[in-house]
Structure formats: C-alpha cells, structure tokens
C-alpha cells in the first residue's frame, strides 16, 4: 500500500481521475492492456484481498463507475444544500462512490457542508484504500 500512498499523497487536490491514473500506472505489466483479466477480480465481483487486485479493479472499472456516479448526480439539487451532510458508503470498496460525490461537491464549492464520511466494507485492504483516497 506504500507505493500507492506515495503516488496519491503527491497529488495537490486528489480526484477520482487521479486515482484511476495511479491505479493504471501500478497495474502489473502483464495486465496493463487488459486489467479486467486479472484472475483475482472474477469479473469485478470478487472480494479483493491484495494490492494488485485493487489496482486492476480501478484500472478496469474505475472510469465506468465514475461516469455512472456523475450521471446519477447530474440532476442532484446542489443549490438546495445547506447544513451539514454525512455520506454513509455501505459496501464502499475503495471509496469510488464517495470520491465522486466529493469531486462534485468540490466543483459546486460545497465541500464545507460535508462533515463526515462513514465507510463500510468487508475487505480490509479495500477499506484501507478507501480511507487513503478520502483522507488525503
């Protein structure tokens, strides 16, 4: 996790796109062009338990998740936000969904309203990655 952490902490203002690019750069060379073929992924439904699997998952599916989240948030009433907000991300994986919401809050200058993010995930290593992604 150290190598990933070093790449991520070097970013001035972390975004989901930064995470995707970092994971692509850290994907094992045998899977750079086809990260979805990494055996531990099991077509993206496996409980991930190692760093290569985490990197390959984001390299393979991160862009798709980011687009889906942005699409879901495009009609969100950002102008109606006032008061504190908490995100509860159940089954957060590496924190992709929460990161996309945070990116949207940054774009709408609403980050000051976000008071807490609660991450819930059965994979310890994925949860650790989510914590890195959302605290840097």
Give, region by region, the residue ranges found by the protein language model.
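Conserved class I S-adenosyl-L-methionine
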Residues: 84-93
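Class I SAM-dependent methyltransferase Rossmann-like catalytic core
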Residues: 45-79
